[in-house]
């Protein structure tokens, strides 16, 4: 819809368009020129123009270089990041006749099982209730009706099976949530401290917590921002930080709302592998 609306405006008015995009495929029929910026190196905050020309020429001549540098190159296959062992484990999270929504039910009578070691994709158009259902599964939004239940083996001592009734510290290390808007979960003034919150809250020592934080920052290509304020990062960097923060707490169940949005090819691949 966005593509078609933009195309109509260009055809009608002859306006010049500059589009900033990781996934250029959808715009190729409208694009006359492609400019590719390189990733800044460790000693510099600035990148440089590494390719500039007609789309066919740029991708034909520099496709391998661009792919190696992390760009999404049209026609390139996405790597298979599935684990070698796809055996389904025990049921760790389930729903019983779940109705979810914010006042008005967006879904009713839902019965689902989620297994250890299994990755489930929740899909649907805008407004279908994906984010609302994700918050409900993570124990952060009360169901309208029915239940979200966690396995007996994962529930806190002296607590029931419904995560919505748990305290925040009881959710930690059991169910993690990566929000659609990363800023909603930031609680520190520095990136490194943000990632260390989970391990610290779980009782890990200072050294261990920051070792975990350093490892996660490296895996997410965020090490050079360790002393930066989370709110100064780009949209894609904020999203990687929110994922790193949740992974640092090693939850048994991880619910992520559009975690790879705004990522280039290399950061997308690294996040999916994790």
Predicted features along the sequence, with ranges:
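Conserved ABC ATPase signature
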Residues: 229-233, 237
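Conserved ABC ATPase "signature" region
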Residues: 207-225
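The feature captures the beta-strand-to-loop junction immediately N-terminal to the Walker
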Residues: 123-125
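Conserved beta-strand-loop-alpha-helix hinge in the C-terminal portion
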Residues: 40-70
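Helix-to-loop junction immediately C-terminal to a conserved catalytic motif
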Residues: 138
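Catalytic Walker B motif of ABC-type/P-loop ATPase nucleotide-binding domains
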Residues: 254-257
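H-loop/switch region of ABC-family ATPase nucleotide-binding domains
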Residues: 21-22
